[in-house]
Amino acid sequence: MFAPSRRRVLEAVASSSSSPVVTLPGFLVPAFQQTAGAAARRNFSATTTRPSKLGRTPLSIPPGVEITIGEPFVKRDMTQWKQQPKRKITVQGPLGQLEMDIPDFIKIDHDAEARRATLSVANRDEKEQREMWGTTWAYLNRFIMGVSEGHTAVLRLVGIGYRATIDTRPEKEEYPGQQFVCLKLGFSHPVEMGVPKGMKASTPQPTRILLEGINREQVMTFAADIRRWRVPEPYKGKGIFVNGETIKLKQKKIK
């Protein structure tokens, strides 16, 4: 019925289908030896977790500056469902004292003899801890510099008739001896702004304002509040510039 060659092929297929054992070529065997558990544990990247570049840098503590680390405490906050233990860090120096709260997973190794402080975290693999590692280092570095040297901000008033003076307003002061920055910026009335507590303001020139304080965030926030009255505009270049700020001038559109 079938040719001899076709009959032999059909018999070989029938005999192979009845056999339950299937053998693989030797070059395919290593590819199937990996277990499912090992494949599931394999990460997308095989590189190790890199620590924070800032956080692992030791902080240098100048003479006259002391750092005090408080005990862990839990601050009740109704806006957060998870209560995170924190520690209070106090930095005291010749110019004043600053305090901040840091998470409990950040450890500070303070060497008083070597005048150094090193920061570390409990788990480097967690993203939140890596982020707070460098952020806490930056805040501590600013606090140490603030209580030892202080922070400054210089504002330049550019514009015809723009002037600034430092006066006192006993009827408006929020604390004894508060200074007020009085600005003439082309409005129909002068602008008066009270200097926050812990800061000093002076005018070396009528068009220059010098702000000094130990808290950099407070100094730059008050400088931004003053700048908001006359934001630099790009056509005439007039406005209030902070710390060497520049602006690219635009050409007027001529119809």
UniProtKB/Swiss-Prot annotation:
Transmembrane segments: none annotated. Residues 39-61 are annotated as: Disordered. Its main location: mitochondrion. InterPro entries: Ribosomal_uL6-like (IPR000702), Ribosomal_uL6-like_a/b-dom_sf (IPR036789), Ribosomal_uL6_a/b-dom (IPR020040), Ribosomal_uL6_bac-type (IPR019906), Ribosomal_uL6_CS (IPR002358). The keyword Mitochondrion applies. One of its GO terms (molecular function) is rRNA binding. Signal peptide: none annotated. GO terms for cellular component: mitochondrial large ribosomal subunit. Keywords: Mitochondrion, Ribonucleoprotein, Ribosomal protein. GO terms for biological process: translation. It comes from the Eukaryota. Pfam families: Ribosomal_L6. It is found in: Mitochondrion. The keyword Ribosomal protein applies. Belongs to the universal ribosomal protein uL6 family. Component of the mitochondrial large ribosomal subunit (mt-LSU). Mature N.crassa 74S mitochondrial ribosomes consist of a small (37S) and a large (54S) subunit. The 37S small subunit contains a 16S ribosomal RNA (16S mt-rRNA) and 32 different proteins. The 54S large subunit contains a 23S rRNA (23S mt-rRNA) and 42 different proteins. Component of the mitochondrial ribosome (mitoribosome), a dedicated translation machinery responsible for the synthesis of mitochondrial genome-encoded proteins, including at least some of the essential transmembrane subunits of the mitochondrial respiratory chain. The mitoribosomes are attached to the mitochondrial inner membrane and translation products are cotranslationally integrated into the membrane. This is Large ribosomal subunit protein uL6m. It comes from Neurospora crassa (strain ATCC 24698 / 74-OR23-1A / CBS 708.71 / DSM 1257 / FGSC 987).
